[in-house]
């Protein structure tokens, strides 16, 4: 069995949640990562949506949450394929998108400070040589304020 795990990596307002909602086969396959244990279930596809901005956070997610899947389900022949969905850095558009989702009532707290100030790194795939890893580069989603 192959498990395709899609990990969103991008600034607030880049389109991570929109990507998950438009690509996952069903919403039960989308898991929100807040830096706490995920308790992942065995599914053919998993979309991990969260604020993953650095290689350190990405490594912690993979080695603390995904790696245990191999041990936990050791009775089955499991192949884990990682898809890191990287939203290119465009802080200006992220600010527009954040304002848009605030106006639409999709968020109750704006992310302006995080968008402007947080460190954002390009994923270093050499850190995950034990995995079959694909990097998917995406332009950020564009909301238009009217």
Language model features by range: what are they?
Residues 9, 18-65:
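Conserved substrate/cofactor phosphate-moiety recognition/catalytic segment
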Residues 51-107:
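ATP-dependent NMP and nucleoside kinases share a basic, alpha-helical "lid"
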Residues 1-3:
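Phosphate-binding P-loop
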Residues 14:
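ATP-binding Walker
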Residues 33, 37-39, 68, 74, ...:
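Acidic/proline-rich low-complexity IDRs
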Residues 5-7:
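Short hydrophobic/aromatic beta-strand immediately N-terminal to the Walker A/P-loop
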Residues 27-32, 47, 82-84, 130-142:
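Conserved beta-strand scaffold positions in the cores of enzyme catalytic domains, especially
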Residues 9, 89-146:
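Conserved GTP-binding G-domain of TRAFAC-class P-loop NTPases and closely related GTPase folds
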